[in-house]
Protein backbone atom coordinates (compact mmCIF):
# COMPACT_ATOMS: atom_id res chain seq x y z
CA UNK A 1 0.00 0.00 0.00
CA UNK A 2 2.09 2.92 -1.21
CA UNK A 3 1.32 6.09 0.72
CA UNK A 4 1.97 9.68 -0.28
CA UNK A 5 2.16 11.79 2.89
CA UNK A 6 1.74 15.56 2.47
CA UNK A 7 2.44 18.36 4.94
CA UNK A 8 1.20 21.77 3.77
CA UNK A 9 2.43 24.57 6.02
CA UNK A 10 2.15 28.33 5.82
CA UNK A 11 5.17 28.67 3.55
CA UNK A 12 6.10 25.28 2.08
CA UNK A 13 4.67 21.93 1.06
CA UNK A 14 6.65 18.85 2.04
CA UNK A 15 5.89 15.35 0.80
CA UNK A 16 7.18 11.81 1.17
CA UNK A 17 6.30 8.57 -0.63
CA UNK A 18 6.34 5.43 1.53
CA UNK A 19 6.17 1.81 0.34
CA UNK A 20 3.59 1.11 3.05
CA UNK A 21 1.91 2.79 6.00
CA UNK A 22 4.27 1.38 8.60
CA UNK A 23 5.49 3.79 11.31
CA UNK A 24 9.25 4.13 11.18
CA UNK A 25 9.59 3.13 7.54
CA UNK A 26 11.86 5.10 5.22
CA UNK A 27 10.47 7.03 2.23
CA UNK A 28 11.40 5.96 -1.28
CA UNK A 29 11.14 9.58 -2.42
CA UNK A 30 10.58 12.96 -0.80
CA UNK A 31 10.73 16.65 -1.55
CA UNK A 32 9.58 20.16 -0.72
CA UNK A 33 8.34 23.23 -2.55
CA UNK A 34 7.40 26.75 -1.63
CA UNK A 35 3.65 27.24 -1.99
CA UNK A 36 4.17 29.63 -4.91
CA UNK A 37 5.37 26.74 -7.10
CA UNK A 38 3.13 23.82 -6.06
CA UNK A 39 1.27 24.01 -9.41
CA UNK A 40 4.34 22.42 -11.01
CA UNK A 41 4.33 19.24 -8.91
CA UNK A 42 2.23 17.19 -11.34
CA UNK A 43 4.61 17.90 -14.21
CA UNK A 44 7.81 17.68 -12.18
CA UNK A 45 8.60 15.58 -9.10
CA UNK A 46 5.30 13.74 -8.91
CA UNK A 47 5.19 12.87 -12.61
CA UNK A 48 7.94 10.29 -12.20
CA UNK A 49 6.96 8.72 -8.88
CA UNK A 50 7.24 4.95 -8.96
CA UNK A 51 5.45 3.04 -7.73
CA UNK A 52 2.51 5.48 -7.86
CA UNK A 53 0.72 6.15 -4.57
CA UNK A 54 -2.32 4.05 -3.75
CA UNK A 55 -3.27 6.29 -0.83
CA UNK A 56 -2.73 9.97 -0.01
CA UNK A 57 -2.94 11.37 3.52
CA UNK A 58 -2.08 14.93 4.41
CA UNK A 59 -2.44 17.78 6.84
CA UNK A 60 -2.93 21.36 5.73
CA UNK A 61 -2.81 24.61 7.68
CA UNK A 62 -2.75 26.80 4.57
CA UNK A 63 -5.87 28.21 2.92
CA UNK A 64 -8.54 26.16 1.17
CA UNK A 65 -7.37 27.58 -2.14
CA UNK A 66 -3.87 26.18 -1.56
CA UNK A 67 -5.31 22.79 -0.67
CA UNK A 68 -7.44 22.81 -3.84
CA UNK A 69 -4.34 23.59 -5.92
CA UNK A 70 -2.62 20.56 -4.42
CA UNK A 71 -5.67 18.40 -5.10
CA UNK A 72 -5.49 19.44 -8.75
CA UNK A 73 -1.92 18.16 -8.90
CA UNK A 74 -3.04 14.88 -7.33
CA UNK A 75 -5.37 14.25 -10.28
CA UNK A 76 -2.29 12.69 -11.84
CA UNK A 77 -3.38 9.49 -10.07
CA UNK A 78 -6.81 7.98 -9.53
CA UNK A 79 -6.73 8.38 -5.77
CA UNK A 80 -8.75 10.65 -3.49
CA UNK A 81 -6.68 12.43 -0.84
CA UNK A 82 -7.69 12.31 2.80
CA UNK A 83 -6.95 15.33 4.99
CA UNK A 84 -6.49 15.01 8.73
CA UNK A 85 -9.10 16.79 10.83
CA UNK A 86 -8.44 16.82 14.59
CA UNK A 87 -10.98 14.99 16.72
CA UNK A 88 -11.51 13.98 20.32
CA UNK A 89 -8.96 11.15 20.13
CA UNK A 90 -6.86 9.22 17.63
CA UNK A 91 -3.88 6.86 17.61
CA UNK A 92 -3.48 6.90 21.38
CA UNK A 93 -3.70 10.68 21.82
CA UNK A 94 -6.61 12.41 23.58
CA UNK A 95 -7.38 15.97 22.51
CA UNK A 96 -7.70 18.37 25.45
CA UNK A 97 -8.48 21.47 23.38
CA UNK A 98 -11.71 23.25 24.40
CA UNK A 99 -12.95 22.80 20.83
CA UNK A 100 -10.96 19.80 19.49
CA UNK A 101 -11.62 20.48 15.80
CA UNK A 102 -10.11 23.97 16.13
CA UNK A 103 -6.69 22.61 16.98
CA UNK A 104 -4.36 23.00 14.01
CA UNK A 105 -4.08 19.75 12.09
CA UNK A 106 -0.28 20.04 12.03
CA UNK A 107 -0.18 20.30 15.82
CA UNK A 108 -2.47 17.29 16.13
CA UNK A 109 -0.42 15.18 13.73
CA UNK A 110 2.84 16.20 15.44
CA UNK A 111 1.45 15.16 18.84
CA UNK A 112 0.47 11.78 17.41
CA UNK A 113 3.93 11.40 15.88
CA UNK A 114 5.60 12.28 19.18
CA UNK A 115 3.45 9.82 21.11
CA UNK A 116 4.26 7.06 18.61
CA UNK A 117 7.99 7.74 18.96
CA UNK A 118 7.86 7.58 22.75
CA UNK A 119 5.94 4.30 22.74
CA UNK A 120 8.24 2.81 20.08
CA UNK A 121 11.18 3.55 22.39
CA UNK A 122 9.48 1.54 25.13
CA UNK A 123 8.81 4.54 27.35
CA UNK A 124 5.71 6.18 28.77
CA UNK A 125 6.68 9.73 29.61
CA UNK A 126 5.40 13.25 29.03
CA UNK A 127 6.50 15.03 25.87
CA UNK A 128 6.85 18.69 24.96
CA UNK A 129 6.35 19.09 21.21
CA UNK A 130 7.83 22.22 19.63
CA UNK A 131 7.12 23.13 16.01
CA UNK A 132 9.19 26.07 14.80
CA UNK A 133 8.22 27.62 11.50
CA UNK A 134 6.41 30.79 10.47
CA UNK A 135 4.81 30.51 13.89
CA UNK A 136 6.03 28.50 16.88
CA UNK A 137 3.83 26.10 18.82
CA UNK A 138 4.76 24.49 22.14
CA UNK A 139 2.40 21.65 23.07
CA UNK A 140 2.26 19.48 26.19
CA UNK A 141 1.43 15.77 26.17
CA UNK A 142 1.27 13.78 29.41
CA UNK A 143 2.50 10.22 29.91
CA UNK A 144 -0.97 8.81 29.15
CA UNK A 145 -1.19 10.56 25.79
CA UNK A 146 -3.44 13.42 26.88
CA UNK A 147 -2.85 16.73 25.14
CA UNK A 148 -2.94 19.23 28.01
CA UNK A 149 -2.67 22.44 25.99
CA UNK A 150 -0.01 24.59 24.41
CA UNK A 151 1.30 27.93 23.23
CA UNK A 152 1.28 29.73 19.90
CA UNK A 153 3.80 32.52 19.43
CA UNK A 154 5.27 34.36 16.46
CA UNK A 155 8.26 32.88 14.73
CA UNK A 156 11.53 34.77 14.58
CA UNK A 157 10.81 36.30 11.18
CA UNK A 158 7.42 37.64 12.26
CA UNK A 159 8.97 39.14 15.39
CA UNK A 160 11.59 41.00 13.37
CA UNK A 161 9.08 42.25 10.79
CA UNK A 162 6.78 43.50 13.55
CA UNK A 163 9.63 45.44 15.14
CA UNK A 164 10.67 46.89 11.78
CA UNK A 165 7.09 47.97 11.06
CA UNK A 166 6.42 49.48 14.46
CA UNK A 167 9.76 51.01 15.40
CA UNK A 168 11.85 53.61 13.61
CA UNK A 169 15.46 52.81 12.80
CA UNK A 170 15.37 49.03 13.23
CA UNK A 171 15.75 47.98 9.59
CA UNK A 172 19.13 46.35 10.09
CA UNK A 173 20.83 43.20 8.74
CA UNK A 174 20.31 39.87 10.46
CA UNK A 175 22.70 39.51 13.36
CA UNK A 176 24.16 36.72 15.45
CA UNK A 177 22.89 35.19 18.69
CA UNK A 178 25.04 36.55 21.53
CA UNK A 179 24.75 36.26 25.29
CA UNK A 180 25.34 40.00 25.62
CA UNK A 181 24.62 41.70 22.27
CA UNK A 182 26.50 44.96 21.67
CA UNK A 183 24.87 46.05 18.41
CA UNK A 184 21.30 46.36 17.16
CA UNK A 185 21.46 43.49 14.66
CA UNK A 186 22.67 41.04 17.30
CA UNK A 187 20.22 42.44 19.86
CA UNK A 188 17.24 41.78 17.58
CA UNK A 189 18.36 38.30 16.56
CA UNK A 190 19.24 37.29 20.11
CA UNK A 191 16.04 38.77 21.53
CA UNK A 192 13.82 36.78 19.19
CA UNK A 193 15.79 33.59 19.72
CA UNK A 194 15.79 33.89 23.50
CA UNK A 195 12.08 34.77 23.59
CA UNK A 196 11.21 31.52 21.81
CA UNK A 197 13.64 29.47 23.91
CA UNK A 198 12.24 31.05 27.08
CA UNK A 199 8.68 30.08 26.17
CA UNK A 200 9.78 26.51 25.48
CA UNK A 201 11.67 26.19 28.76
CA UNK A 202 8.82 27.67 30.79
CA UNK A 203 6.36 25.16 29.31
CA UNK A 204 8.91 22.44 30.03
CA UNK A 205 8.85 23.46 33.72
CA UNK A 206 5.05 23.57 33.75
CA UNK A 207 4.82 20.08 32.27
CA UNK A 208 7.41 18.66 34.66
CA UNK A 209 5.53 20.13 37.63
CA UNK A 210 2.23 18.78 36.30
CA UNK A 211 3.49 15.26 35.60
CA UNK A 212 6.15 14.87 38.28
CA UNK A 213 8.90 13.83 35.86
CA UNK A 214 11.09 15.54 33.26
CA UNK A 215 9.40 15.53 29.86
CA UNK A 216 11.10 14.67 26.61
CA UNK A 217 11.37 17.77 24.40
CA UNK A 218 11.03 17.18 20.65
CA UNK A 219 11.70 20.07 18.26
CA UNK A 220 10.60 19.98 14.64
CA UNK A 221 9.81 22.39 11.80
CA UNK A 222 11.77 24.33 9.22
CA UNK A 223 13.19 26.75 11.80
CA UNK A 224 13.92 24.14 14.45
CA UNK A 225 17.65 24.33 13.81
CA UNK A 226 17.57 28.03 14.74
CA UNK A 227 15.85 27.36 18.06
CA UNK A 228 17.81 24.46 19.55
CA UNK A 229 21.17 26.21 20.12
CA UNK A 230 19.54 28.48 22.72
CA UNK A 231 17.87 25.67 24.67
CA UNK A 232 19.37 24.62 28.00
CA UNK A 233 17.06 21.61 28.41
CA UNK A 234 17.61 18.17 26.88
CA UNK A 235 15.94 17.96 23.48
CA UNK A 236 15.78 16.06 20.21
CA UNK A 237 15.58 17.70 16.77
CA UNK A 238 13.39 15.52 14.54
CA UNK A 239 12.63 16.82 11.06
CA UNK A 240 10.17 14.04 10.18
CA UNK A 241 7.73 14.34 13.10
CA UNK A 242 4.73 15.30 10.93
CA UNK A 243 5.41 12.35 8.64
CA UNK A 244 5.76 10.08 11.69
CA UNK A 245 2.29 11.20 12.73
CA UNK A 246 0.78 10.74 9.27
CA UNK A 247 2.23 7.22 9.04
CA UNK A 248 0.82 6.37 12.47
CA UNK A 249 -2.63 7.69 11.54
CA UNK A 250 -2.62 5.83 8.22
CA UNK A 251 -1.62 2.58 9.95
CA UNK A 252 -4.37 2.99 12.56
CA UNK A 253 -7.06 3.74 9.98
CA UNK A 254 -5.99 0.93 7.67
Swiss-Prot record:
Q: Which reaction does it catalyse?
A: (R)-pantothenate + ATP = (R)-4'-phosphopantothenate + ADP + H(+)
| Cofactor remark | A monovalent cation. Ammonium or potassium.
Transmembrane annotation, as ranges: none
An annotated GO cellular component = cytoplasm
| Pathway(s) | Cofactor biosynthesis; coenzyme A biosynthesis; CoA from (R)-pantothenate: step 1/5
Q: Which GO molecular-function terms appear in the entry?
A: ATP binding; pantothenate kinase activity
UniProt entry tagged with the keyword Transferase: yes
| EC number from the UniProt entry | 2.7.1.33
The protein's matches in InterPro entries, at most eight in alphabetical order, are given as:
ATPase_NBD (IPR043129), Type_III_PanK (IPR004619)
GO biological process assignments: coenzyme A biosynthetic process
ATP-binding as a keyword of this entry, yes or no, is yes
Q: Where does ATP bind?
A: 7-14, 134
Arranged from A to Z, the UniProt key words for this protein are: ATP-binding, Coenzyme A biosynthesis, Cytoplasm, Kinase, Nucleotide-binding, Potassium, Transferase
Concerning Pfam families, the annotation shows: Pan_kinase (PF03309)
Where does this one sit in the cell? Cytoplasm
Q: Which residues form the active site?
A: 106 (proton acceptor)
Where does this protein hold substrate? 97, 104-107, 184
Q: Which cofactor does it need?
A: NH4(+); K(+)
Summarize subunit and interaction data from the UniProt record for this chain.
Answer: Homodimer.
Q: Which family does it belong to?
A: Belongs to the type III pantothenate kinase family.
Task: Relate the protein's function as given in its record.
Answer: Catalyzes the phosphorylation of pantothenate (Pan), the first step in CoA biosynthesis.
What name does UniProt use for this protein? Type III pantothenate kinase
Gene name of the record:
coaX
Amino acid sequence: MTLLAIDIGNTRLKWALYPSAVPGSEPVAHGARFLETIDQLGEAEWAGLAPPPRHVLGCCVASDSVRHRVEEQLELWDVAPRWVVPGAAEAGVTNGYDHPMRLGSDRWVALIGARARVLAAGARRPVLVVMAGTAVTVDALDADGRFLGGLILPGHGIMLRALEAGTAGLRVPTGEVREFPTNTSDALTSGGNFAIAGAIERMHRHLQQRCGEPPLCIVTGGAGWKVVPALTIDHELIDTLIFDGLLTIAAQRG
